[in-house]
């Protein structure tokens, strides 16, 4: 019981936002219009754990989310904004989120190359099976 409490406390602590600074190199609209299903959205996170990840990996990016798009059948948020990304969160686990969640964060798009239609479909089905 103590370990469960401690792990939840630590996850909440590490998920807290530190300094929110944005040096986004692309507009939200440009990212929204450019993303294609199965792209990976790299994110420069602003949580305490993101700072540690960036330091340890010597990378600008601390986080990644898979873009499945509005046709993927993910649930919409309470505000009606369609969930189009799937990511792993320290507190919530695997979750779907809207693109607007990263509206004011520095991001970059990575597009898979050399994957066939079967591979892309298998990846989408795998993600759905884990939700």
Residue ranges and their predicted role:
Residues 1-131:
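Cysteine-nucleophile amide-bond enzymes
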């Amino acid at each position: 019981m103590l370990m469960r409490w401690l792990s939840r406390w630590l996850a909440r602590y590490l998920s807290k936002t530190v300094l929110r600074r944005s040096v986004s190199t692309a507009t939200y609209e440009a990212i929204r219009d450019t993303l294609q299903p199965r792209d990976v959205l790299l994110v420069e996170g602003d949580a305490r754990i993101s700072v540690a990840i960036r330091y340890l990996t010597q990378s600008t990016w601390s986080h990644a989310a898979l873009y499945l798009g509005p046709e993927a059948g993910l649930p919409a948020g309470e505000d009606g904004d369609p969930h189009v990304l799937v990511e792993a969160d320290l507190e919530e686990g695997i979750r779907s989120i809207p693109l607007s969640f990263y509206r004011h964060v520095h991001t970059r798009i990575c597009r898979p190359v050399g994957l066939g239609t079967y591979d892309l479909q298998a990846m989408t089905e795998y993600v759905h099976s884990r939700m």
